[in-house]
Design a protein with these regions (language model features):
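Loop-centered beta-sheet repeat module
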Residues: 162-209
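Short, surface-exposed amphipathic charged segments that create phosphate/polyanion-binding patches used
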Residues: 109-117, 165-173, 231-237
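Well-ordered alpha-helical segments embedded in enzymatic catalytic cores
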Residues: 23, 59-60, 162, 234-237
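Conserved small/polar residues in nucleotide/adenosyl-binding loops
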Residues: 241-248
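Metallocofactor- and cofactor-centric catalytic cores in central/energy metabolism, strongly enriched
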Residues: 2-90, 94-134, 142-156, 190-193, ...
Length: 252
């Protein structure tokens, strides 16, 4: 992925919305299939209007991989999404992220230096045989770290099967960076909460009072800042207002 950054030229800042729209469309028309603009479905309408395809982050990365014609990918999303697309596309294809400061709060909660330190402490101080897993919403450096230590990437859709596989390896899982996905998935697979611990990358310590030989999964203290705002009461209110709906529509 190209990481050079430049300030926006003044003449673009002086353009009206209509002028910008026409200019972008002119470039798209000129480059044709050489340019591909995957766009995350959380983007604003003013960006989505130029999208060649919209979808979630993993879907867009797979679509980029399948596109062998495009030379330039302008990925309208956040940093880890563009990195994932860059991993999957060919070397001669360039990935551009319009705003290099566009980040995911959860992905930013686990950097490679923190991951390496946690691995050293867990293996050398606590003498744990660690198998790392990372949610796909993580940096390329974290994905590389996980792969180098025999682990795997996890999606929301395959989390249960991947965590089940990891548990069968007889090692202690280090799950980054979404502690809630790791905890809920492991719990659904029968791992008791008392056999789970939380690693705090800021305090650089393990939050666990049990026996280390019973520890099945270490959860990275990370989370989605948006999901943290949802509470049980929100669901109860939604169910209250949809109480007249058909039973099938209420099954979550």
């Amino acid at each position: 992925m190209l990481t050079a950054t430049k300030s926006i030229p003044e003449h673009y800042l002086q353009m009206t919305q209509e002028e910008l729209k026409n200019h972008i469309q002119s470039i798209k028309d000129t480059l044709g299939d050489r340019l591909f603009m995957p766009t995350h479905h959380y983007q604003k309408d003013e960006v989505v209007q130029f999208a060649d395809i919209t979808g979630d982050s993993l879907e867009l990365a797979r679509i980029c991989k399948a596109n062998t014609q495009a030379e330039y990918f302008v990925f309208n999303g956040v940093h880890f999404m563009a990195e994932t697309a860059d991993i999957l596309t060919d070397d001669h294809q360039d990935i551009y992220l319009p705003d290099l400061s566009a980040g995911c709060s959860m992905a930013d909660m686990a950097n490679i230096q923190q991951a390496l330190h946690s691995y050293d402490v867990l293996t050398q101080h606590y003498h744990l045989d660690i198998l790392p897993l990372t949610y796909v919403n993580s940096t390329a450096a974290i994905k590389k770290f996980v792969g180098e230590h025999g682990g795997s990437c996890v999606t929301s859709g395959n989390a249960k099967s991947v965590v089940k596989w990891a548990l069968q390896q007889g090692k202690t899982i280090l799950f980054l960076p979404d502690q809630h996905l790791g905890r809920n998935t492991a719990y659904d697979l029968g791992v008791p909460l008392e056999h789970m611990a939380v690693w705090d990358p800021i305090k650089k310590q393990l939050d666990y009072d049990g026996r280390h030989d019973q520890l099945r999964i270490v959860l990275w203290k990370g989370h989605c800042s948006v999901h943290e705002k949802f509470h049980k009461a929100h669901i109860e209110i939604c169910l209250l207002y949809t109480s007249d709906a058909a039973d099938d529509s209420l099954r979550v």
